[in-house]
């Protein structure tokens, strides 16, 4: 379909006698909405990047949903908040599909902390050191998991993280064993990603999009499939999220999680009591150096743990993964101690908890390299993009 004919068709949908008015009670045709939808449709057909500010009341959601659901392209709709994700998935998209008489396959893909990790649930239940209060909650999760269709923790009857067991039943990217996991075939996250691969339209979030851009730029795999069209609602949040995603973070909690995971694996092996004891003593040195805010000494002490983990790399899939995680932490500490060109390092603290961070000084260049260079047209929308009526600052931050 030509650019003009596609844009004309989209325009007709918004008219007082169009598809939306016929199917949606109370619909009012607004010229600003029609114009925005036309701009979006044109960009989708011609390619490129559209940066558009849509003030509250413009109706930007309909302005991008109609062309997104009318086109034949594979589309990603990314948001900053879960509330908007749910609104799109369960209210807006079904309503617009019905109004237009179209039936595109739609999938929702969330971050990994929203999905049950069967392997970590199993390990937590098998751990004899699991506290009675935690075991009770874990058993409730286990019962729910047997009946859950998708393993999305949103359908759990209680908040697992508020109950103190969230980290025991989910896996971070560092903890995930990937295709080597014994639960790969029944993993809720894998199934959600497969559904996204097969869908015409995927609803997701900015953090996941940026994580995917980071992985693809380094040839380390992918989180999301490739898309012809990427629509970023609530786009104003992208630059700040990019600072975090394309930087590095080292907190004592991250190091402690690694140590606890390593201890659990060594305990399971049954014949590594000496290494288990040595690592505990070495981690105490890491902990002391971190609390004394001596990151250089943290690095030296941590390298001993890296060596210990690497020496046991071949013992199991889990020890190999832990060795990789230890090396990744080592590289992050080194980068923070000696920031590469274009990056800045700093320290944040909350009470006694400190985090050392590294981030790009300017987000524009890194977004240009890792995101906008991809073979997809991009549509960036927000109610707040201009400053003093100008897009100049936003354009600089977006690259």
Q: Would you name each region that the model predicts?
A:
Residues 70, 86, 91-94, 173-174, ...:
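Signature of the SF2 helicase/ATPase Hel1-core->accessory helical subdomain module
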Residues 167-202, 213-221, 299-399:
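A contiguous, basic/glycine-rich beta-loop/short-helix subdomain that forms a polymer-engagement track
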Residues 50-53, 76, 379:
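Short hydrophobic/aromatic beta-strand immediately N-terminal to the Walker A/P-loop
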Residues 56:
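The conserved Walker
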Residues 41-42, 61-74, 91-95:
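Walker A/P-loop NTP-binding motif
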Residues 73, 102-105, 225-228, 374-376:
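Short glycine-/polar-rich loops that comprise or flank the Walker A/P-loop
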Residues 3-52:
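Conserved pre-motif I regulatory segment
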Residues 2-23, 73-202, 207, 301, ...:
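A substrate-engagement module of RecA-like helicase motors
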